[in-house]
C-alpha cells in the first residue's frame, strides 16, 4: 500500500547502467550475512551447535570507541565488541565472561523512543567517505543478525539479549564487519543510556529501513540484554553460496514460511558485499541506499551469468557486469514456490512493502518473551506497536 511508504527519496545514481532504472542514493555496506559456516543443502537433521568458533580469551576493550574509518573492515577491531557503560556501570565488559546490568525502559514513552530514532537518523550520513555515504544498510544488517539467530526448536537466540556484544558471537564469520556497526550504535547509547542494546539495535533497523524510503515498521520495546553465556552458536544465519533447501532450513527454524523468506530477501535492495568480509563482491542494485522493489525486478528481468573470477561463486548482470546476485538470490527464481512471490513483488512495490513490513517486524521480535512486551502495553498507541515518523515527515510537519 502506498500509504506504507515513508518520506522523500532523493535520486542519486550509483553508476551508469545499461538500463533505465530509477536510482536513489548509493551505499556500500553488506546487508546480509553470507560468510558464516552453515549446514549445506540439503540440510542435515540437526543443526551444528558451532561451525568454526573456538574458545576465546577474555579481552579488555576501549569504551565508547568512535565510529568511523573502515566501517566494515574485517580485522582485529571487528573481533572486539565495543561496549559502553550503561546505567550503574552496566555493559562494561566484553568476552566470554562478560556481564550486563538491566536497563530500565518501561517508564519511557513513544516520544522518548522517537528521540532515539531521530538521533540514529541524523547520523546515517554523518561520514560521506564511508563506502557510498550511508550507514543505513549496515544497521539493517546489524538488526538482522541480532534477530536472525533464533531457533524455535530450542527457543534460543533472537533479538532478546544483544549477545553479539560478546565473544564468541562477535567473532562469527557472518558478523564480520559489524563491530563498527555496534560502535555506531554505542554512540547513540551514550546519549540514551536507559535503552537496552537489544531495543536499540532493532530500533536502528527500523530507522534505517524507513529513512531509506521503505515502509513503516511497527516496533515494540521490551527486549532485555543478556550475558555472554547466552551467545548463540555459529551457523544459524544464511550462507550465500547455498540453494533453496538451505534457505528453508535456516528460515523455517526461525518460524518463517516461503513467502516471508522472499519478502525478507528484499532487504538486498540495500547495500553490497565485500571481499574482505563475506568474500562476495558488489551491490545487488544500482541504488543501494534506496529501499525499493528493484531487487525483484532485476531478478526477473535481467540476464544473470556466473562471474568468472577468483572469488566464491556468484552471478553478475549481463548488461553492465557491475551488479551481483548470490546463489541464494538466484534460488528465489529457480524454486517455483519462491518464484511466484518474486513475480508478485516485481510487479507491485506496494505488495512487497506490505509483506516486508509484517515479516521484518516479526523478525525483530524473535526470541522475545511475550511478558517482556506486556510491561509496555500502556505506553503503546492504543495497545498497538509504535510507528515512528521519518525525518522527512517531521520536517514537513514544521
Curated annotation (Swiss-Prot):
BP GO terms, sorted: cellular response to oxidative stress; hydrogen peroxide catabolic process; response to reactive oxygen species
EC number: 1.11.1.5
TM spans (from-to): none
Alphabetically ordered keywords of this record: Heme, Iron, Metal-binding, Mitochondrion, Oxidoreductase, Peroxidase, Transit peptide
Bias (Basic and acidic residues): 222-240
Pfam family, one: peroxidase
GO molecular function annotation: cytochrome-c peroxidase activity; heme binding; metal ion binding; peroxidase activity
Annotated compartments: Mitochondrion matrix; Mitochondrion intermembrane space
Coiled-coil ranges (or none): none
Cellular component GO terms, alphabetical: mitochondrial intermembrane space; mitochondrial matrix
Binding site for heme b: 268
Residues of the active site: 145 (proton acceptor), 284 (tryptophan radical intermediate)
Site residues, Transition state stabilizer: 141
Cofactors that this protein relies on: heme b
Targeting signal (transit peptide) range: 1-34
Keyword Oxidoreductase (UniProt): yes
Gene3D superfamilies given in the database record: 1.10.520.10, Peroxidase, domain 2
Family, similarity comment: Belongs to the peroxidase family. Cytochrome c peroxidase subfamily.
Assembly and binders: Forms a one-to-one complex with cytochrome c.
UniProt-listed PANTHER family: CYTOCHROME C PEROXIDASE, MITOCHONDRIAL, THYLAKOID LUMENAL 29 KDA PROTEIN, CHLOROPLASTIC-RELATED
Biological function: Destroys radicals which are normally produced within the cells and which are toxic to biological systems.
Descriptive protein name: Cytochrome c peroxidase, mitochondrial
Organism ancestry: Eukaryota, Fungi, Dikarya, Basidiomycota, Ustilaginomycotina
Designated gene of the protein: CCP1
